[in-house]
Amino acid sequence: MSHSGKSPLPLSGHPLVTLRQLERSDAPAWYAYLADPAVVEHTSWALRSADDLQANFDDYASAGPASSIRLAVVLRDGGQLAGTIGFNAISPQHRTAEIAYDLAPAVWGQGVATSVVNAVVDWGFQRLGFLRIQATVLESNERSIRVLERCAFEREGYLRCYRQIRGRSGNFWLYARIAAAR
């Protein structure tokens, strides 16, 4: 299992967007929509400025086999950042990862999330060699729950007080998709 840049990036599967490597120069646009109250409500991000994202870029730039991978979801027309998607908690030993994604509200409700999640999950199984891809989703994030279910993820459990979210314990659903179950 390797993701050291040798594997071609997945195709988005959606006419509105394409995928490319996330770059440090994307931080202001990424922060702009992550700070939107409609996005904040359903995520565990606790950002004060675009500078708070910089440590993430250090991890994404690492060539280590367990380093997180994050791709930019960009509009085909104009190239503006519309979201990000990738893998965290990568275990080369167990061939597992956790998928994470976020989209700007401007592209919600257009099938973008379902398309890019399917594309990146298939890439994770076929190109990166994962056997299991899981997702944790805040219980109130009904849109993301529907995306995961449309993408053949199965609900595996309920994680009480799983993460602190802006000073409060948050409950999450655990979903997973297994390579053999595709």
Segments from the language model and where they lie:
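Proline- and acidic/polar-enriched loop/turn elements at helix boundaries
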Residues: A46, A119, T136-V137, R160
